[in-house]
Regions:
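Conserved acidic segment of CheY-like receiver
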Residues: 3-13
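Two-component/phosphorelay signaling modules centered on CheY-like receiver
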Residues: 13-31
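Acidic, metal-coordinating helix/loop segments flanking the phosphotransfer/catalytic sites
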Residues: 35-50
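Conserved phosphotransfer microenvironments
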Residues: 53-68
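His-Asp phosphorelay/catalytic-motif detector in bacterial-type signaling
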Residues: 73-78
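Alpha4 helix (beta4-alpha4-beta5 surface) of REC/receiver domains from two-component response regulators
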Residues: 86-101
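Output/docking surface of receiver
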Residues: 98-110
Length: 123
């Protein structure tokens, strides 16, 4: 049986590795990406079921989300962006760039299955 692929973009060990482990526990294959310049191309090449994007990484993360949205081959993929609880500006910028869901790290940790269900039922 082929397990669905999730791409997780992160630089920070926590919560990135924790998210990877939780997704693997839910039977996802996980591809970790740590360079925002490669995120759109990797997404197009690997065709994941969904993406998680850590907004606290260095580089143009919202630009990477915009590239994913602008490409017909990837524009339909759910993007869940997350940031520390106090980084509301980063969450708003990610939503404007096209992230389907924007959540705080505490919400991500506590409600992963619910977020997956919501992301995979978006139009």
């Amino acid at each position: 049986m082929l397990h669905p692929l999730a791409i997780v973009f992160y630089e920070r060990l926590m919560p990135g590795s924790q998210l990877v482990n939780r997704l693997q526990d839910l039977n996802y294959r996980v591809l970790a990406v740590n360079n925002p310049a490669l995120l759109a191309a990797t997404t197009k090449r690997e065709t994941p079921l969904l993406l998680f994007v850590d907004l606290e990484a260095r580089g143009d993360i919202t630009g990477a989300i915009e590239k994913i949205r602008a490409d017909a081959a990837t524009s339909h993929l759910p993007v869940i962006a997350f940031a520390p609880d106090h980084k509301t500006e980063a969450l708003a910028a990610a939503q404007k760039a096209g992230a389907n869901l924007t959540v705080s790290e505490s919400a991500l940790a506590g409600h992963l299955q619910t977020l997956l269900d919501q992301a995979l039922h978006l139009d």
